[in-house]
Amino acid sequence: MELGKTRRIHIVGIGGAGMSAIAELLLKSGFDVSGSDLQTGEVTDKLAEHGAIIYRGHSAGHIEGCDVVVYSSAVRKDENVEISAAEKAGIPVIKRDEMLGELMRYKYGICISGTHGKTTTTAMIATMLMESGESPTVMIGGVSDYLGGSTVVGEGKYMVIESDEYDRAFLKLTPTIALVNSLESEHMDTYGTLEELKNAFIAFADKVPFYGRVICCVDWPEIRKIIPMLNRRYTTFGIEEHADVMASDIVMEKNHTVFTITAFGSRYEGVRLHVPGRHNVLNALAAFSAGIELEIAPEKLIAGLGCYSGMRRRFQIRYDNGRGLMIVDDYAHHPSEVKATVSAAKNGWADSRIIAVFQPHLFSRTLEFADEYGWALSRADSVIIAEVYPSREKAENFSGVNGNLVAEAVRRAGGKHVEYIEGRETLSGSLREHCSDGNMLLFMGAGDITHMASGLAEELRNGSVT
């Protein structure tokens, strides 16, 4: 593997999951790698064992002798002394995704994009490949117990990458298979309009070479609109719309889903998933479609899907007392994701009382999607709304925007038991009161609500909640 005359590569933020995986791949490819991070630990120690030079903290001297500097999205470019020093010295400074795109040129790239379902579909494809005897390189934006984390640096030709549309990052990648799992309004701070977002996905599909393939879900109206604009071969999949790869006879019970796949005229019955929800059937169809393009035997693909055991924070059951009291933790933060997660709970656990505990993520998203959240949450038996998790935003820039906007929207949509609770301690106390047999507390959000879910589960395990 060569990157021109590049020999030494310095990585700012090397301890992050995505950056450490790139560092490991570069080391295995024979490059000299150095990197810095504010914190060091097990991940950076492992890289050091492989030959990386690791610096704790940032200093202009760390870039001395390097040919290129790579930085992650978590690093503020205009505030980092190493990046500033590199720019002054005329050393190229690039984002993680550009380096990843260059590395993909030496592999068979399988890139999974879409507004929703990226993480799960990427993990499903990785599981299928590994169960089929392949050794792929995998980078996922979540943690898989099957994979032993979020990244795998394999020896084989396949590179399976979760490809984020935020900040147009996925346009730096070089896929042979480009998978578009879903498409609707999101990241308007990057795109401004839905049309611009669709144009970005078309450009992503155009990154595929003439011998590659685009795989897309026709159950999404906006994807159906862009299909006539695709300039590459494509495969369609779906449940509701006619497609090349379809699912039928879907039966859901608790954490198990059984269905039939019909692919290009062939029928495969008894496909089993150990995760709930119609949305995961669509994710499985996406993975199966990719496997068919790779000419892997359908029987191996189905067996691989059966080995998929889920992702952390994707309907992760953190506690189950065997009498119906459950704590479930999910990353859902877009209305469609929330709707799919609540539906999975209601369909799979029909006898349970579903208590949705939702933490809105970003003030801008709360303002834009309040009504949609209302409809998505209204099917739950009871709804508790927490304060907005601000992430990169500041409350003073969004006067009057809070979780109560969502609570009111749930009531308008027909929700009967709805609370907006301010303050972490008050929320914790209310949640403890709901810990009764037959109740599923379904925590959803991309913020720190996950810590409340794990904390409550731990309290239940050690008997401190009665």
Swiss-Prot record:
It is found in: Cytoplasm. It catalyses: UDP-N-acetyl-alpha-D-muramate + L-alanine + ATP = UDP-N-acetyl-alpha-D-muramoyl-L-alanine + ADP + phosphate + H(+). GO terms for molecular function: ATP binding; UDP-N-acetylmuramate-L-alanine ligase activity. Its EC number is 6.3.2.8. InterPro entries: Mur-like_cat_sf, Mur_ligase_C, Mur_ligase_C_dom_sf, Mur_ligase_cen, Mur_ligase_N, MurCDEF_pg_biosynth, UDP-N-AcMur_Ala_ligase_MurC. Pathway: Cell wall biogenesis; peptidoglycan biosynthesis. Keywords: ATP-binding, Cell cycle, Cell division, Cell shape, Cell wall biogenesis/degradation, Cytoplasm, Ligase, Nucleotide-binding, Peptidoglycan synthesis. GO terms for biological process: cell division; cell wall organization; peptidoglycan biosynthetic process; regulation of cell shape. ATP binds at residues 114-120. Coiled coil: none annotated. The keyword Cell wall biogenesis/degradation applies. It is an enzyme of class 6 (ligase). Pfam families: Mur_ligase, Mur_ligase_C, Mur_ligase_M. GO terms for cellular component: cytoplasm. It comes from the Bacteria. HAMAP family: MurC (MF_00046). Cell wall formation. PANTHER family: UDP-N-ACETYLMURAMATE--L-ALANINE LIGASE, UDP-N-ACETYLMURAMATE--L-ALANINE LIGASE-RELATED. Belongs to the MurCDEF family. This is UDP-N-acetylmuramate--L-alanine ligase. It comes from Chlorobium limicola (strain DSM 245 / NBRC 103803 / 6330).
